[in-house]
């Protein structure tokens, strides 16, 4: 047993640790909007609106080096796990991704820079995705006016952790299976789109006299 009620059974040889023991946490901030020298630079400034994909390659807004140096935000090296920490979207999901370029963050984001001698960033990505509903209940800040995650709850979450070799095997299996499922979803969506088009075309034909229904009366 993992000893963690909401996780349940895990292999006995997996290590039980806390997230804060394998990750360094960073927050973000917003450079002054009144200073144009801080904005429209080349440094991605990631906010919740950018968290629509697993891999974060860019952002809508960008800041300059001056903006970075004169605000609470900092440069996050590539390979960190990025979480939305404050947003209405936390009513139903925790958006999560990994940046493959250095980025800065706004104050509604958190970055987990991981000890890669112990854990793969993509393992944490999949862990958050797979346990999203449970983690939402555990991490939610009580009494907040806007949905947000409580840092202490996140940092102290217990994490069942296999060794790196097993993490790699798990990730490889997940990549294969999720790719297969995504392909099936895409095929199903294409079929649904085609059926909707046929339905609309049939209705159009029926109401414009293109279908002879006299023999069916």
Protein language model features and the residues they cover:
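Low-complexity, Lys/Gly-biased intrinsically disordered segments
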Residues: 15-53, 67-71
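Short helix-capping and inter-helix turn/linker motifs at the boundaries of alpha-helical repeat units
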Residues: 99, 145-150, 182, 192-193
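Non-catalytic DNA-recognition/assembly elements of restriction-modification systems
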Residues: 1-29, 156, 160, 164-168, ...
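Short, solvent-exposed loop/turn positions at domain surfaces
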Residues: 4, 32, 69-70, 143, ...
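A short glycine-rich beta-alpha junction/loop motif
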Residues: 102-110, 141-168
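Cytochrome P450 core scaffold surrounding the K-helix E-X-X-R motif
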Residues: 55-59
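A short beta-sheet element
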Residues: 47, 64-131, 150
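Short amphipathic coiled-coil heptad-repeat segments
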Residues: 1-12, 180-217
